[in-house]
Amino acid sequence: MNSMKYRDLREFLSLLEERGELKRITQPIDPYLEMTEIADRTLRAEGPALLFENPKGYDMPVLCNLFGTPKRVALGMGQEEVSALRDVGKLLAFLKEPEPPKGFRDLVDKMPKFRQVLNMPTKRLFSAPCQEQIWQGDDVDLRRIPVMQCWPEDAAPLITWGLTVTRGPHKERQNLGIYRQQVLGKNKLIMRWLSHRGGALDFQEWCQENPGQRFPVAVALGADPATILGAVTPVPDTLSEYAFAGLLRGHKTEVVKCLSSDLEVPASAEIVLEGYIEPGEMAAEGPYGDHTGYYNEVDHFPVFTVTHITQRQNAIYHSTYTGRPPDEPAVLGVALNEVFVPILQKQFPEIVDFYLPPEGCSYRLAVVTMKKQYAGHAKRVMMGVWSFLRQFMYTKFVIVCDDDINARDWKDVIWAITTRMDPARDTVLVENTPIDYLDFASPVSGLGSKMGLDATNKWPGETQREWGHPIKKDPQVCARIDEIWDELAIFSDREPRR
């Protein structure tokens, strides 16, 4: 499956530069708003990753737009083409519900998957590049890092690509998650994690088991792309993100123990923040411009106290911005969409395609096409989408169409909605469901409704009327007109259209 081989972020950047996918910017650029403007224009033009080598006021380079095209997301997952991400999804579907070989031929077919599994265990190092430089105690100062302030009304600089490492009590497996972190001071950050996310759940369990005791946390900045992408991919609960990153990368993930706790962080990370969360210590977070295109509400989240900063020599700070799509999370969503399809098809073989339009904030609206087999089938599928993967917990709208509709063509989808739906019969409303905290349209923070649209052809039992059948052209006539089309010269002054 692998074709893009790299060991760490720096090696990945070198490979991108060889392909013309990385631009070094030597002019002084301000992390306050200017980097966002340049990155936004570059992303909208499907441009390269950006390495700002001279941030104003800092001596640490800033990397932006790393995942600014689906192609670079695929490369980060070890694939040359976006279409190959379906293979990543098939591998995840296999790992989620592995099946023993049915015979010798099946064993041969599955050997590549079994071979990849050999890269799953992590490799623990006693020393690592991420600990080449160490600051602790009073020497800790987050202001050395060129953290971007992305939008004019943002409350403060914001760490965006921090890979947060936690472990709940009595758990061997660590959790990796991407949570934004507002800079409060030289050694304080706000950890914005939602209550159902892995890090927040680990913290809740810790507080129950160890009341009043500090909760160890580590944040890796500038981890290798496979590890970052592993943290945002629907990895089975029995598989660690480090193990999955090893599968993507083609060799084992190397980790090292933190200086202040037993947590293990990526050995090649550019920067690592170590510290703790004091139970009960909270702070007001925000407002920040986010992926919806709006500034979000202010809310309270735990404070992360940093006791150690370790980093590589000549460290690179990896950052991004979030705003109205397209932004980097939206591009990431387009690429990960290809990973989701085989996972859903494993559970629901009737699904033909699944699409999360980026303009729907990457996850708030889904279009599903399916081979309908019985009355009520579309409603079963929409309920399945909402419940199967936690990534779709916040999907507000699910549109289900037949397999003659192209899920990725709005003209097709709108035609199906307007010709195959009766609003009262074919609309499903579900109230009091989990909703993204950033969704200010919901009546209560974190709780709102969902809508399912059954835009499939209706079967007996779903309608009492004779159902229409689509107009189709006569293929023989089409072939005849194809033969004489150029002679007709109808569009002689411009490109012919058929």
UniProtKB/Swiss-Prot annotation:
Its cofactor is prenylated FMN; Mn(2+). This is 3-octaprenyl-4-hydroxybenzoate carboxy-lyase. It is found in: Cell membrane. Mn(2+) binds at residues 175, 241. Transmembrane segments: none annotated. Belongs to the UbiD family. It is an enzyme of class 4 (lyase). Prenylated FMN binds at residues 178-180, 192-194, 197-198. One of its GO terms (molecular function) is metal ion binding. The active site is at residue 290. It catalyses: a 4-hydroxy-3-(all-trans-polyprenyl)benzoate + H(+) = a 2-(all-trans-polyprenyl)phenol + CO2. InterPro entries: UbiD, UbiD-like_C, UbiD-like_N, UbiD_bacteria, UbiD_Rift_dom. It comes from Pectobacterium atrosepticum (strain SCRI 1043 / ATCC BAA-672). Its main location: membrane. Disulfide bonds: none annotated.
